Every structure is written in structure tokens, then in C-alpha cells.
Amino acid sequence: MHIAQELADETCNSPRGAGHARLRYPSDRRTAIPRNRRPLEGLWRFRRVRDIDLQVKEGEFICFLGPSGCGKTTLLRAIAGLDIQSRGTICQGGQDISRLPPAQRDYGIVFQSYALFPNLTIEKNIAFGLENIGRPRREIASRVSELLELVGLSSQGRKYPAQLSGGQQQRVALARAMAISPGLLLLDEPLSALDAKVRVHLRHEIKELQRKLGVTTIMVTHDQEEALAMADRIVVMNQGGIEQVGTPTEIYRHPKTLFVADFIGETNQFPATVGKGAQVEIGHTRFACAEHRLPSGASVVAAVRPADIIPHGAAAHRATGLDAVGNADNLIDAHVEDMEFLGMFWRTRLSAPRLKEKALVADFSTNAVRRLSIEIGSAIQVEIPQERLLLFAKA
């Protein structure tokens, strides 16, 4: 699959091979894409997608992740042919499919609402696509049986959708999408309608199924944890464009923009000034920070995740923040203002003189809180690890 600008001097015969996908929208203007025209509304809905240039490898699990309205579902619908882009091309297996109707594209799709046929049994729902393309009855029966076993519903084939739980219905929708052995599987927020425990269980099942079948998969989600747990690569989107593409570890540990850092997890953010080398000044205090390419003296935002802050017990009342040879040591005295128990950890709000009026939020493990006797009112010392203190240019 390959999406490219209509007027670009490119072909769809990508040298990377038929198993790759390439997605591109023109960068010279925003692209208005009609979503749905509903007679009752009498208006066109538009979603704008811009600067998209993405390649998807064969067998890869990709997540489009971003806030509501960022363009992730629009992009998925364009790939599916449910919305036709006004500019740009989409290629799959070296073939331009930009203007093909959905029925002629090689994909299976699973929606948030399951979209099962309520009047058909589970077996008939799964067999629907195979019957439409005229497969022999014996082949259909064998394929349906295979898929029911694969999704753990071998004994449920003669039931109707209303007789199944939400998680079971989503498995049926997944089996139906996979019945025709598509080259591409599209998942449009498939788990968002399920309760938390079922969602966690089913995301592992979907990932395991995808690995077994080796099908190239693109999933839309706004759930950061879901994307981190399931994806081989995450495409973080914002305001119709791509902010960053990378593995879950790269996205979480090495965000390229402040938006990505803040959207994937949580961050403490401080106005700061770039110092010499790998140092930054927050307030009037010098801290060692991660390597960066920002010019000395630039006004930036310094960010650190609550989970990266390390407690060290009783405060030592070190006012300067410098070690014996004058280097920033990133140890600061802090006062525990509030604590919130969240099961696996305590979310702790700290005040620190070196940070002036800015509160510092830290996540301490239950064991650390017990070992160091941390409680509201405690005077403690915490460390901001150098490699976890990231700098970002101001927007």
C-alpha cells in the first residue's frame, strides 16, 4: 500500500516490495476530506489530514494514536475507501487503489460497534464474506470452524450475537474480518466499548492472533496504554498531521515534541533556559539534562515524568544543588504536600524551594514509600535522573 501526492513524479511500484504500505498527503495545503453526508443534517462533515508520509511493513502492527479530531479515523477511512481523499494516492502491493470502491480493496475491518448481523448466527456472520465471493460450502464450513477455534468460540457458533457478551461479539467481528484472509486488517477503536478488564484481556488476544496470522494491521485508538501494549510502531497524530512515528519504547522514552511527551503518559513541565553542554537552568538552579541540540541560552520547556523521579529519603538541606566539584547533581530537597494511593504506586505532590512555586508530581512505589517512611509532611530528598530530564523548544 502506498499513498502519494497525485501530481508527484512517483509510481506505485515501490522498490520496498509489495508487502510495504506508503501513505502520503501533500504538504502544500490542508486536505479537506468529506466524511459522511447525512440527509438529516444537510451538511458535509470535513476532516483535514496533512503532511502524511508513512510506510507500513508487511506483518506489522501499527497504531494511529491521538486525541479526538486529530485525523486518525479519517486516515483509516481513506485507506478503507470509505472516504476518498481529494488529493494524494494510496497503493497496496504496488497497485494504486485510491479510486477503488471498498469492495475491491484487500482488507478486513472491525468497527467499535461490532456491526454484526443480529438475524444471523455466529457461524453465518463469519461466513458472510466467504459466501459473497462464492467459496464452496465445504471450504466455508472448514474456515468458519478454524476461526471459531482460533478466537475461542468453538461452542458458540449456533448462537446469535445478542446471546454473547461484548467481548465475545468483538471476537466474532474479528473472525469475520479475517475470514477472507485479507492482506490488511483495519481496526477502528475495537476495544473502546468494552469494560476495563475485558479490554486488557482482549488486546492480548488480538495481538497474539495477529502474530499467528502475520496479517498487516492498522488500529486506531486514543488509549495510550493500548497503543503501547499492542503496537510494533505507533503513529502519534495531532491536528491532522503526524507528530512522531516510532516503537512504543522510542515514543515513551524519546519523544520528539512536547505534545508527544505530554500525550503519552504524564509529565512535569518547567520553563527553563538551556545552559552549557547537557545542562539547563530551572529558576536559578542548574540541573544536568539529557543530550539535546538546542542552542545555549534558548528558552525551553524542561520535562520529567512522575515515574522517573527517585526518592532518597530524608532531606539533606542542600541549597546549591552542586556536587563537590561544582556540577549539577539533580538532587533536591522537597516537602510532601499530598499523597494519593493508586494501587501499585503513590502519586505524591511535592514542593521544592529550588523549583520556586512549581509543584513537582512524583510516582513512588508502595515499597519505596514503606521503606523510606514517606508520608504527608515528610521532608525528603528526590533525584531527577539526568537522562530523564528532557528539553523541548517552546511552541
Swiss-Prot record:
Query: Where is this chain's protein located in or outside the cell?
Result: Cell inner membrane
The UniProt record lists the keyword Cell inner membrane: yes
User: What GO cellular component entries does it have?
Assistant: plasma membrane
Q: What catalytic activity does the UniProt entry give for this protein?
A: Fe(3+)(out) + ATP + H2O = Fe(3+)(in) + ADP + phosphate + H(+)
Q: Specify where the region named Disordered lies, as residue ranges.
A: 1-21
For whether the record's keyword set contains Ligase, the answer is: no
The topology of this chain with respect to the membrane is:
Peripheral membrane protein
Give EC number(s), comma-separated: 7.2.2.7
Please list the GO terms describing molecular function.
ABC-type ferric iron transporter activity; ATP binding; ATP hydrolysis activity
Q: Which domain of life is it from?
A: Bacteria
> Which residues are in the ABC transporter domain?
23-264
Chain sites annotated for binding ATP: G66, P67, S68, G69, C70, G71, K72, T73
- Grouped into one coarse class, the protein's main location is membrane
| InterPro entries assigned to the protein according to its UniProt record, in alphabetical order | AAA+_ATPase, ABC_SmlMolc_Importer, ABC_transporter-like_ATP-bd, ABC_transporter-like_CS, AminoethylPonate_ABC_PhnT2, Mo/tungstate-bd_C_term_dom, P-loop_NTPase
Q: Which UniProt keywords apply?
A: ATP-binding, Cell inner membrane, Cell membrane, Ion transport, Iron, Iron transport, Membrane, Nucleotide-binding, Plasmid, Translocase, Transport
> Function, please?
Part of the ABC transporter complex FbpABC involved in Fe(3+) ions import. Responsible for energy coupling to the transport system.
Q: How does it assemble?
A: The complex is composed of two ATP-binding proteins (FbpC), two transmembrane proteins (FbpB) and a solute-binding protein (FbpA).
What is stated as this protein's family in its record?
Belongs to the ABC transporter superfamily. Fe(3+) ion importer (TC 3.A.1.10) family.
Matching entries from NCBIfam families are given as:
PhnT2
PANTHER family with a match to the protein in the record: PUTRESCINE TRANSPORT ATP-BINDING PROTEIN POTG (PTHR42781:SF5), SPERMIDINE/PUTRESCINE IMPORT ATP-BINDING PROTEIN POTA (PTHR42781)
User: How is this protein named in the record?
Assistant: Fe(3+) ions import ATP-binding protein FbpC 2
Organism of this sequence: Rhizobium meliloti (strain 1021)
